Structures are given as structure tokens and as C-alpha cells.
Swiss-Prot record:
Transmembrane segments: 70-88
Free-text note on domains in this protein's UniProt record: The BH3 motif is required for the induction of cell death.
Protein name: Activator of apoptosis harakiri
Complexes and interactors: Interacts with BCL2 and BCL2L1. Interacts with C1QBP.
Stored Pfam families: Harakiri (PF15196)
Short motif BH3, span: 33-47
Any one GO cellular component localisation term in the record: mitochondrion
Main location: membrane
Superkingdom, taxonomy of origin: Eukaryota
Disulfide bonds: none
Length: 92
């Protein structure tokens, strides 16, 4: 039985780098894993930079609707603030 988490309970496959008999294979597997993680990090970095390079229009579909309702939203916020202030005075 192989003690590593990947093979626990199932036994090792034909080629397993976890045993003490093949330390070179374990080292090679670690190098392959490190290279894969590095490639994954590079790809994620490339995608993030590509996303940042493209300018996006913030909320393009909601902007006209927000402009039309902005005075009502401001008035509603003031009414809510007044109500909160009055409720605070009553409870104190």
C-alpha cells in the first residue's frame, strides 16, 4: 500500500514516485508538477492582463435607466435618512 494521499486505499499504480525505491522518479514528478503550476500561473496572468487591457463600459445597459431615475433615488435616500433620524429620536 502506498501512503500518499493520491493512492491511499487503492494501492500504487504501476509507476509510482511515492516509494523510497525510486527517489529520482519522485523528484521528476515534483519538477513536472512545479512546471505545470508555473504554466498555469503564467496563463492566468496573461488572461488577467488581457482583461485589464480591454476597457469596459461600466454598466452600459443600466446607465440610461439610472440617469432617468437619479432624482427619485436621491429623494428616496433623503426620505430614508429622515425616517431613520426620526426613529432614532423616538427611541432615545
Amino acid at each position: 500500500m502506498c501512503p500518499c494521499p493520491r493512492h491511499r486505499g487503492r494501492g500504487p499504480p504501476a509507476v509510482c514516485g511515492c516509494g523510497d525505491a525510486r527517489p529520482g522518479l519522485r523528484w521528476a514528478a515534483a519538477q513536472v508538477t512545479a512546471l505545470r503550476l508555473q504554466a498555469l500561473g503564467d496563463e492566468l496572468h496573461r488572461r488577467a492582463m488581457r482583461r485589464r487591457a480591454r476597457p469596459r463600459d461600466p454598466l452600459p445597459a443600466l446607465l440610461p435607466a439610472l440617469r432617468a431615475r437619479w432624482p427619485w433615488l436621491c429623494a428616496a435616500a433623503q426620505v430614508a435618512a429622515l425616517a431613520a433620524w426620526l426613529l432614532g429620536r423616538r427611541s432615545a
